[in-house]
UniProtKB/Swiss-Prot annotation:
It comes from Arabidopsis thaliana (Mouse-ear cress). Coiled coil: none annotated. Residues 148-315 are annotated as: Disordered. This is HVA22-like protein h. Belongs to the DP1 family.
Amino acid sequence: MIGSFLTRGLVMVFGYAYPAYECYKAVEKNKPEMQQLRFWCQYWILVAALTIFERVGDALASWVPLYCEAKLAFFIYLWFPKTRGTTYVYDSFFQPYVAKHENEIDRSLIELRTKAGDLAVIYCRKAVSYGQTRIVEILHFVALQSTPKPKPKEKKQAAAPEEEEQKQPDLKATSQAASSNPQVRLQSKKPQLVTKEPISPKPLSSPRKQQQLQTETKEAKASVSQTKLTTLTPPGPPPPPPPPPPSPTTAAKRNADPAQPSPTEAEEASQTVAALPEPASEIQRASSSKETIMEETLRITRGSLRKARSAGAPR
């Protein structure tokens, strides 16, 4: 048994190369014979059909012993001058079958041509539309890259809490200075008592500001309730008499060192601090005044009831 590689090489030589050379010699003659040209045309028709069915035969019958050798012998049988198997196979098998189904083959070929043309047109249109969409997307992307991007608002929102954090240490420092210096505390309290301006709400951009505003509103409500309680309480003690005029020695000392506070100013500050009403004492006074009023009304009603009972009782 000859190897498959060797048989394939022999098929290429004796089935294609040598017959092609003989066909060339027949065509290039000065007066080619029609029978010889017809013979070689029939041979190449059979070889084309054999190569088509060879793929199926190799897949199904390649395991049969001497399959490759039989294929090589068939190629030689077709063109060998003594056998001339081409005329026999063509006239007895191939030509009658093709003549019987020639009309069907022509119709199927025409249908395939029309379908292939329609498919080619459809795929060309799809390719053109896809190319147009891709070009538009590329141009849009290039335009977006060329235009300057707007600055994000997140930077402003992030800068607002930083400013608040910077302001908070300043407020703490001022509160500490006010607690250490009583004059500054009095000066900071006086405008709050005199001027009560409405607090204008500012636009908020963070939850921290919202919490601060809520706390401020709660404190404002508490201060309003305390002021209402103070209005209900009876008037307090009369204000203290004005301090005597300063002596010339104290005036000279005040002019000598203006940085140090004078004793009269310290006394005034202490008197104003003492005169300021405390919220807890005011609430207690208001509650005690209400209790006394209720007790008096109860006493009056009890006395009137006793008089009515004594008047209505039989003597």
